[in-house]
Amino acid sequence: MGRFISISFGLLVMFLSLSGTGAKQDCLSDWSFYEGYCYKVFNEKKTWEDAEKFCTEQHKGSHLLSLHNIAEADFVLKKTLAMLKDGVIWMGLNDVWNECNWGWTDGAKLDYKAWNEGTNCFVFKIAKNHWSHMDCSSTHNFVCKFRV
């Protein structure tokens, strides 16, 4: 009887640890969870268009990074600083298809801004913690993001 209880308790502990809250388990392997979204830093340089295409191929609903508040920006900053040497990553913000009408590739509303004026695509300059316009044909590392 004691052995049965021990095994049952062990299975219960294993089940509870695997079930968790459910949210983090919906992230793919090597992706990080934050506030209902999964994020992954890619240390491979691509043009903005190629990076966005790559993100959409990773998971349904995945796009280049969109940022909506300073806390989210700080989370991404901490994730990328350790991995990337140049500290510049593509973001989903652009006006490639609709000049002067800025929007995120994931369709989210532009509700947080931190940039200098320039060209059609945006990068997040990690070391300076601000956004900057960049030529879309230049190559940079990137972060993909999707909603859990």
Curated annotation (Swiss-Prot):
Cystines in this chain: 27-38, 55-144, 121-136
* GO MF, one annotated term: toxin activity
Record's subcellular location: Secreted
Query: According to the lineage, what is the superkingdom?
Result: Eukaryota
- A Pfam family this protein belongs to? Lectin_C
Q: Which residues form the signal peptide?
A: 1-23
Role played:
Interferes with one step of hemostasis (modulation of platelet aggregation, or coagulation cascade, for example).
Q: What is the name of the protein in this document?
A: Snaclec 5
Q: Which organism is it from?
A: Daboia siamensis
